[in-house]
Every structure is written in C-alpha cells, then in structure tokens.
C-alpha cells in the first residue's frame, strides 16, 4: 500500500542520521507551545507536548528550554526546526546542530510536528480560555 511504502521510504531516508529530534513551536503573549518528536534510526519513538513560560524573549526562552530539557539527555545528531529558529541567537554549544528543511522527508516530519503542535495548541488554548471565563 501507499502508506506502507511512504513509511518505509521515510525510515530509509531518516535512518541516515541515527538520532533526530523535531522541534516545532508557536507562541502567544505569555507562553510557548512546543511539540518534540523523537526519531531513532528513522523510527518515531516518542512525542512530547510542552508549554514553556515566555521569559524575557522568545529566543532566550527557547535557549533555556534546550539547555534544561537536554541537560540529562543525549543530544540527537540533528534537530529539525522551523526556519525562524535559525535566526535566533541561541548561544548554544556547537553540539546542537539545527536543520530547517524546505523539501523532502525532513520537511515531512517537520510538517507532522507542526500538525501535532496545532492540535496541542488548540486543546491547550481552549482549556486556558475556559479557565479565564
């Protein structure tokens, strides 16, 4: 079937890197909503949705997130991220390797993270709105 072939091709293409984490985010006035997908040898092994307090600035909050979240974890070979992350001055060690794909399998997994993020954002945002009423 088509889906099986697509999955197989993704595994083959993604397995060129041993470990990839896909990070997608969006912000509102006070919070950063993020989804992280964890791929190991081309296979999606975990997904985490997070709400991060927005500190001084978006780039500072994202930098602190990466430092704290990965403090006790092995860094992946690459992070697949939205293009705007590359524009931030994150001041992270050179061990953090960010890729912002425009096409191909890496773009597809970023799109998948963004779909998950939008779903998470809508649910969380609705919960927040209901709490305020």
Annotate each predicted stretch with a short phrase:
Residues 2-133:
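Conserved catalytic/ligand-binding micro-motifs in nucleotide and anionic cofactor chemistry
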């Amino acid at each position: 079937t088509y889906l099986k072939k697509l999955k197989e091709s993704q595994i083959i293409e993604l397995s060129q890197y041993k470990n990839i984490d896909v990070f997608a985010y969006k912000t509102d006035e006070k919070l950063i909503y993020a989804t992280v997908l964890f791929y190991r040898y081309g296979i999606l092994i975990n997904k985490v949705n997070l709400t991060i307090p927005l500190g001084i600035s978006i780039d500072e909050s994202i930098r602190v997130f990466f430092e704290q979240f990965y403090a006790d974890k092995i860094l992946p070979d690459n992070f697949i991220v939205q293009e705007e992350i590359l524009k931030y001055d994150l001041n992270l060690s050179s061990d953090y390797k960010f890729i912002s794909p425009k096409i191909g399998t890496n773009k597809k997994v970023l799109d998948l993270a963004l779909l998950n993020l939008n779903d998470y954002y809508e649910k969380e945002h609705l919960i927040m709105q209901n709490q305020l009423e």
